[in-house]
């Protein structure tokens, strides 16, 4: 997913096929985190990787055009790609229908999986080790074969970044590898015996916070990666992105935060309990200010992503005598209480789309409701009617996908390239999502640009909600709000300042799919940013009489 880092013109790329995933080793059974087959040695560096030249292995894929007989279908393994096509130049409707029929046949071979699915996003300041930690998880859970890992090691050495071997698994484009900074939201999958996971590796640099918001908007759990190294922790907290990421995660609606105190094996730290306590004490104060409840919302885990320590397997005896808690993956496996609105209206914000052989595929997280193969749905806001051909996860398929699943959906019925845009949502035909350009909202002001310190009517910035990004202008201020009692204090104020909460009317540059907070919180939360900082966050409380009447009319129809 290519994203423009400039907030003023930030637009996800919706036309290119996604990059081919790294070859993955077939995984028959994934061990429990506490009994994983990979046991990290108590050393700050991973075991050396064999780099002698051998034939490179690649993941097996199956071309739709190669499926001719029932035997071809039977030979498809669950870990193979669902389908692969060579071009997207098909214009003939009959040929598109033929491809769609073959896709339907292929996905019938794949198993359904009843394990809970969690979307996790890696957050934190630049160079905290987010991509390295993500990559080490992929290796430890068997998603990267040795030949591919050896290839990444060679490439890291060629770029004089020997310590970035695991990061190369997630940072796939040349800019990320040469600069050593994540730009896009990396995406990968792994599993344990308890759960299935989608990894969203977000950028840490302040220029790419809009990209981070796209990743965090899909997540159930945030993993805030903290460098324990002397100077790096302080840089991330004092003027860095550590606290902003934690604040944004709370605003966007992430339920849990797991704080991974990374680089504990670093020579300036050496598993120091005093350093760990210093970090956790300071962060707890900041996280509470961001709205996180220390008793139930966040957990601390010490470890090392590069050293693969306390990531999958718990710490081996002798590594750290003061920590006996679960590993990072063990902590994730133990999380419970995810709220899933299965009975609600279908809502799937589209994060990516691409076209194969005339079939449009979209990727997104099911926020509410359910979606089934064969179902007719709308792409909003344009009300394009499409049919669902298939629903697939990384190694499983679904007849019906439920809230929390991050899936690829093959669709039939799209004509033209303007049906899908940033902010598009899949919705039920008889339960449409509101499309509005003016809203009433409660806004909490966090910061203001240096050149304009007051929040007043006519103030303009950038509006982020789910995958939508639009210009926004303050139309009017209705009343200031007491945040403790939620009561209105002053009617029609002329201005507001940092720290205030205000009920106001906002006008968007283009109509966006939004809902009221009482109906669907995930489609009601938003943030307001300028080019480099988060100005405010808020929630939609009223979509307006006209929008409500239109929804009522469409529902009856």
Swiss-Prot record:
Residues 115-342 form the tr-type G domain. It is found in: Cytoplasm. CDD domains: EF1_alpha, eRF3_C_III, eRF3_II. Residues 180-184 are annotated as: G2. The record marks 273, 407 as: Interacts with GTP/GDP. Residues 124-131 are annotated as: G1. Keywords: Cytoplasm, GTP-binding, Nucleotide-binding. Residues 40-71 are annotated as: Disordered. One of its GO terms (molecular function) is GTP binding. Residues 262-265 are annotated as: G4. One of its GO terms (biological process) is translation. GTP binds at residues 124-131, 201-205, 262-265. GO terms for cellular component: translation release factor complex. It comes from the Eukaryota. Residues 304-306 are annotated as: G5. Residues 201-204 are annotated as: G3. Involved in translation termination. Stimulates the activity of erf1. Binds guanine nucleotides. Belongs to the TRAFAC class translation factor GTPase superfamily. Classic translation factor GTPase family. ERF3 subfamily. This is Eukaryotic peptide chain release factor GTP-binding subunit.
């Amino acid at each position: 997913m290519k994203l423009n880092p400039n907030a003023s013109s930030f637009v996800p790329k919706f036309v290119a096929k996604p990059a081919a995933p790294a070859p993955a080793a077939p995984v028959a059974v994934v061990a429990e985190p506490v009994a994983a087959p990979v046991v990290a040695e108590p050393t700050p560096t991973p075991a050396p990787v064999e780099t002698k030249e051998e034939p490179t292995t690649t993941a097996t894929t199956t071309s739709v055009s190669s499926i001719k007989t029932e035997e071809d279908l039977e030979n498809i393994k669950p870990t193979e790609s669902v389908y692969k096509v060579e071009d997207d130049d098909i214009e003939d409707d009959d040929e598109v229908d033929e491809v769609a029929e073959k896709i339907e046949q292929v996905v019938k071979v794949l198993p359904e999986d009843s394990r809970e699915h969690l979307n996790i996003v890696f957050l934190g300041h630049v160079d905290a080790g987010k991509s390295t930690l993500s990559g080490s998880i992929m290796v430890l859970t068997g998603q990267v074969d040795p030949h591919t890992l050896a290839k990444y090691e060679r490439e890291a050495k060629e770029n004089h970044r020997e310590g970035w071997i695991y990061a190369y698994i997630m940072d796939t484009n040349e800019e990320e590898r040469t600069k050593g900074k994540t730009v896009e939201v990396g995406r990968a999958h792994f599993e344990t015996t308890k759960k299935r996971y989608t990894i969203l590796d977000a950028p840490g640099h302040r220029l790419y916070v809009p990209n981070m918001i796209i990743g965090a908007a899909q997540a159930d759990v945030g993993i805030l990666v903290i460098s324990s190294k002397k100077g790096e922790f302080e840089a991330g907290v004092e003027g860095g992105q550590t606290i902003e990421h934690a604040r944004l995660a709370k605003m966007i609606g992430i339920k849990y935060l797991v704080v991974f105190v990374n680089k504990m094996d670093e020579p300036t730290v050496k598993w120091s309990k005093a350093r760990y306590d210093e970090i956790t004490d300071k962060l707890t104060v900041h996280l509470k200010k961001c709205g996180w409840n220390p008793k139930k919302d966040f957990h601390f885990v010490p470890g090392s992503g590069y050293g693969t320590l306390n990531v999958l397997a718990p710490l081996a005896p002798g590594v750290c005598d003061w920590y006996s808690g679960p590993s990072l993956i063990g902590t994730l496996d133990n999380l419970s209480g995810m709220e899933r609105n299965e009975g609600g209206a279908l809502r799937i914000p589209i994060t990516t789309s691409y076209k194969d052989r005339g079939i449009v595929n979209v990727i997104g997280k099911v926020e509410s409701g359910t979606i089934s193969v064969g179902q007719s749905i709308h792409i909003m806001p344009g009300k394009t009617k499409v049919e669902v051909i298939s629903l697939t996860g990384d190694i499983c398929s679904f007849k019906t996908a439920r809230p929390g699943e991050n899936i690829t959906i093959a669709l039939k019925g799209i004509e033209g390239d303007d049906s899908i845009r940033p902010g598009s949502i899949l919705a039920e035909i008889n339960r449409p999502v509101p499309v509005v350009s003016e809203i009433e909202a409660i806004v909490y002001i966090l910061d203001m640009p240096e050149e304009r310190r007051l929040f007043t009517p006519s103030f303009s910035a950038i509006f982020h909600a789910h995958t939508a990004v639009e210009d926004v202008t303050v139309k009017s201020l209705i009343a200031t709000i007491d945040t403790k009692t939620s009561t209105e204090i002053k009617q029609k104020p002329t201005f507001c300042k940092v720290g205030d909460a205000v009920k106001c009317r906002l006008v968007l540059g283009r109509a966006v799919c939004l809902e009221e907070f009482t109906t669907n919180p995930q489609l009601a939360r938003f943030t307001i940013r300028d080019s480099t900082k988060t100005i405010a966050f808020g929630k939609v409380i009223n979509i307006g009489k006209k929008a409500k009447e239109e929804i009522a009319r469409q529902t009856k129809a």
